[in-house]
Protein backbone atom coordinates (compact mmCIF):
# COMPACT_ATOMS: atom_id res chain seq x y z
CA UNK A 1 0.00 0.00 0.00
CA UNK A 2 1.49 3.33 -1.09
CA UNK A 3 1.27 6.15 1.47
CA UNK A 4 1.77 9.87 0.94
CA UNK A 5 1.95 12.71 3.44
CA UNK A 6 -1.11 14.98 3.42
CA UNK A 7 -1.25 18.70 4.30
CA UNK A 8 -1.51 18.02 8.04
CA UNK A 9 1.47 15.68 8.04
CA UNK A 10 -0.37 12.36 8.20
CA UNK A 11 0.53 9.47 5.94
CA UNK A 12 -2.57 8.32 4.07
CA UNK A 13 -3.13 5.66 1.37
CA UNK A 14 -3.33 6.69 -2.28
CA UNK A 15 -5.80 3.87 -2.96
CA UNK A 16 -8.57 2.25 -0.90
CA UNK A 17 -10.50 -0.81 -2.14
CA UNK A 18 -9.15 -0.23 -5.65
CA UNK A 19 -10.27 3.40 -5.81
CA UNK A 20 -7.83 6.32 -6.07
CA UNK A 21 -7.86 8.67 -3.06
CA UNK A 22 -6.96 12.36 -3.07
CA UNK A 23 -5.06 13.28 0.09
CA UNK A 24 -6.02 16.50 1.87
CA UNK A 25 -3.93 19.29 0.31
CA UNK A 26 -5.12 22.15 2.50
CA UNK A 27 -8.02 24.57 2.39
CA UNK A 28 -8.59 25.94 -1.13
CA UNK A 29 -5.78 23.79 -2.57
CA UNK A 30 -7.86 21.24 -4.50
CA UNK A 31 -10.71 21.86 -6.91
CA UNK A 32 -12.69 18.72 -7.71
CA UNK A 33 -13.64 18.07 -11.32
CA UNK A 34 -16.55 16.22 -12.83
CA UNK A 35 -20.29 16.46 -12.57
CA UNK A 36 -22.88 15.58 -9.97
CA UNK A 37 -24.24 12.05 -10.11
CA UNK A 38 -27.69 11.78 -11.56
CA UNK A 39 -30.34 9.06 -11.55
CA UNK A 40 -31.82 7.77 -14.80
CA UNK A 41 -35.09 9.27 -15.99
CA UNK A 42 -37.94 6.84 -15.35
CA UNK A 43 -41.23 6.73 -17.20
CA UNK A 44 -44.33 4.54 -17.19
CA UNK A 45 -42.70 2.20 -19.73
CA UNK A 46 -40.32 1.08 -16.95
CA UNK A 47 -43.17 -0.25 -14.79
CA UNK A 48 -45.93 -2.85 -15.11
CA UNK A 49 -49.02 -1.66 -16.96
CA UNK A 50 -51.17 -1.93 -13.83
CA UNK A 51 -48.62 0.09 -11.84
CA UNK A 52 -48.07 -2.69 -9.30
CA UNK A 53 -44.33 -3.19 -8.71
CA UNK A 54 -44.81 -5.66 -5.84
CA UNK A 55 -43.07 -9.01 -6.32
CA UNK A 56 -43.43 -12.24 -4.35
CA UNK A 57 -40.19 -12.04 -2.33
CA UNK A 58 -36.90 -10.25 -1.75
CA UNK A 59 -34.85 -12.55 -4.01
CA UNK A 60 -37.20 -11.85 -6.92
CA UNK A 61 -36.85 -8.11 -6.29
CA UNK A 62 -33.04 -8.39 -6.22
CA UNK A 63 -33.05 -10.40 -9.46
CA UNK A 64 -35.31 -7.83 -11.14
CA UNK A 65 -32.97 -5.08 -9.92
CA UNK A 66 -30.08 -6.88 -11.66
CA UNK A 67 -27.99 -7.70 -8.58
CA UNK A 68 -24.49 -8.91 -9.53
CA UNK A 69 -21.15 -9.50 -7.82
CA UNK A 70 -19.35 -6.32 -6.78
CA UNK A 71 -22.37 -4.02 -6.67
CA UNK A 72 -23.12 -1.40 -4.02
CA UNK A 73 -26.18 -1.86 -1.83
CA UNK A 74 -27.38 1.07 0.25
CA UNK A 75 -29.71 0.85 3.23
CA UNK A 76 -31.23 3.49 5.49
CA UNK A 77 -31.06 3.45 9.29
CA UNK A 78 -34.64 4.48 10.10
CA UNK A 79 -35.37 1.12 11.79
CA UNK A 80 -32.26 1.52 13.94
CA UNK A 81 -31.57 -1.47 16.22
CA UNK A 82 -34.85 -3.08 15.12
CA UNK A 83 -33.64 -3.41 11.52
CA UNK A 84 -34.39 -7.00 10.52
CA UNK A 85 -34.82 -5.88 6.89
CA UNK A 86 -31.10 -5.42 6.22
CA UNK A 87 -30.38 -8.81 7.75
CA UNK A 88 -33.05 -10.43 5.54
CA UNK A 89 -31.65 -8.56 2.54
CA UNK A 90 -28.18 -10.02 3.00
CA UNK A 91 -29.60 -13.48 3.76
CA UNK A 92 -31.16 -13.30 0.27
CA UNK A 93 -27.91 -11.99 -1.27
CA UNK A 94 -26.05 -14.96 0.28
CA UNK A 95 -28.67 -17.45 -0.99
CA UNK A 96 -28.17 -16.00 -4.48
CA UNK A 97 -24.40 -16.68 -4.15
CA UNK A 98 -23.56 -13.03 -4.83
CA UNK A 99 -20.12 -11.89 -3.61
CA UNK A 100 -18.05 -8.76 -2.98
CA UNK A 101 -20.90 -6.39 -2.18
CA UNK A 102 -20.06 -2.93 -0.90
CA UNK A 103 -22.59 -2.19 1.85
CA UNK A 104 -23.26 1.55 2.02
CA UNK A 105 -25.53 2.05 5.06
CA UNK A 106 -26.53 5.37 6.57
CA UNK A 107 -25.77 3.69 9.92
CA UNK A 108 -25.30 0.27 11.47
CA UNK A 109 -26.42 -1.03 14.85
CA UNK A 110 -25.80 -4.07 17.09
CA UNK A 111 -28.66 -5.89 15.29
CA UNK A 112 -26.38 -5.99 12.25
CA UNK A 113 -23.92 -8.34 13.99
CA UNK A 114 -25.84 -10.93 11.91
CA UNK A 115 -23.86 -9.63 8.90
CA UNK A 116 -20.44 -10.55 10.30
CA UNK A 117 -20.72 -14.03 8.78
CA UNK A 118 -21.23 -12.38 5.37
CA UNK A 119 -18.13 -10.22 5.86
CA UNK A 120 -16.21 -13.40 6.72
CA UNK A 121 -17.39 -15.41 3.70
CA UNK A 122 -17.01 -12.58 1.15
CA UNK A 123 -20.69 -11.92 0.48
CA UNK A 124 -20.00 -8.40 1.78
CA UNK A 125 -16.53 -7.15 0.79
CA UNK A 126 -16.52 -3.99 2.87
CA UNK A 127 -18.65 -1.36 4.56
CA UNK A 128 -18.65 2.35 3.80
CA UNK A 129 -20.60 4.11 6.52
CA UNK A 130 -20.83 3.92 10.27
CA UNK A 131 -19.64 0.72 11.91
CA UNK A 132 -21.01 0.44 15.43
CA UNK A 133 -21.26 -2.32 18.03
CA UNK A 134 -20.07 -5.79 17.02
CA UNK A 135 -19.51 -4.66 13.40
CA UNK A 136 -17.27 -1.87 14.64
CA UNK A 137 -15.27 -4.31 16.75
CA UNK A 138 -14.98 -6.75 13.82
CA UNK A 139 -13.71 -4.07 11.45
CA UNK A 140 -11.41 -2.47 14.04
CA UNK A 141 -9.74 -5.86 14.47
CA UNK A 142 -8.93 -5.86 10.73
CA UNK A 143 -11.13 -8.84 9.88
CA UNK A 144 -12.99 -7.29 6.95
CA UNK A 145 -11.73 -8.39 3.50
CA UNK A 146 -11.76 -4.83 2.15
CA UNK A 147 -10.93 -1.58 3.88
CA UNK A 148 -13.79 -0.04 5.86
CA UNK A 149 -14.51 3.58 5.03
CA UNK A 150 -16.04 5.52 7.91
CA UNK A 151 -18.39 8.17 6.60
CA UNK A 152 -20.49 10.72 8.43
CA UNK A 153 -24.11 11.10 7.34
CA UNK A 154 -23.17 14.28 5.44
CA UNK A 155 -20.02 12.69 4.02
CA UNK A 156 -22.16 9.88 2.67
CA UNK A 157 -24.43 12.38 0.93
CA UNK A 158 -21.43 14.19 -0.57
CA UNK A 159 -19.93 10.92 -1.86
CA UNK A 160 -23.19 10.11 -3.66
CA UNK A 161 -23.75 13.63 -4.99
CA UNK A 162 -20.18 13.97 -6.25
CA UNK A 163 -20.28 10.59 -7.99
CA UNK A 164 -17.58 9.09 -5.74
CA UNK A 165 -19.98 6.26 -4.86
CA UNK A 166 -22.58 4.88 -7.24
CA UNK A 167 -25.44 3.05 -5.52
CA UNK A 168 -26.70 0.10 -7.54
CA UNK A 169 -29.50 -1.02 -5.20
Predicted regions mapped to residue ranges:
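Conserved alpha/beta enzyme-core scaffold
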Residues: 2-169
Amino acid sequence: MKLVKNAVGRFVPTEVNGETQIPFKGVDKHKPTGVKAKPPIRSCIDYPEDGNKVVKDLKTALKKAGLKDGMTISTHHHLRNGDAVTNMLFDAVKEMRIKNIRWFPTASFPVHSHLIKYLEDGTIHHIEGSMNGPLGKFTTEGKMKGVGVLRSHGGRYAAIQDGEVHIDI
